Amino acid sequence: MTDVQIPSPIVATRVAEADRLRFLPTYFGPSMLRMLRGEALVFGWMGRLCAAYHGGFWHFYTLSNGGFYMAPEHDGRLRIEVDGNGFAGELSADAAGIVATLFALNQLCAELAGTADADALIDRYHHLAAFASEHAEAAAIYRAID
């Protein structure tokens, strides 16, 4: 008999208020400049992707596979438009945050290309992409980042 192992779903956990200060250095690295750059890229990508976004509070999430993402606190859906691939659609704030975080990680990896720091961020990109493939809005997320 063959034992078939079914992979466990990747679980997202919202970071508690008391743990928020450790989030950015844990996932973007200990450099203050990189932490600020990473956070600013996520916010910036959301601003480029969503005309209705004008800042606000963000939730931080850790993933059981070692990844992470950030998502704006917002009730309802957000209109996301990606000029580079023609995607236009409405996503939950959670899915929109995943898209913005993936774009930000991609850009930060390109900026740090050829360094060990880039390798860690590339892994985090792939961890988040794996989670996105299990998300309820996976099809829309992947169309947005295509």
UniProtKB/Swiss-Prot annotation:
Q: What does this protein do?
A: Could be involved in overcoming restriction barriers during establishment after conjugative transfer.
Q: Write one Pfam family the protein is assigned to.
A: Antirestrict
- Designated name of the protein: Antirestriction protein KlcA
Task: Give me the gene this protein comes from.
Answer: klcA
| UniProt keyword terms in alphabetical order | Plasmid
Q: Which species does the entry assign this protein to?
A: Escherichia coli
How is this protein induced? Answer: Expression is decreased in the presence of KorA and KorC.
Q: Which residues form a coiled coil?
A: none
Q: Give the family, as the similarity comment puts it.
A: Belongs to the antirestriction protein family.
Cited InterPro entries? Antirestrict, Antirestriction_sf
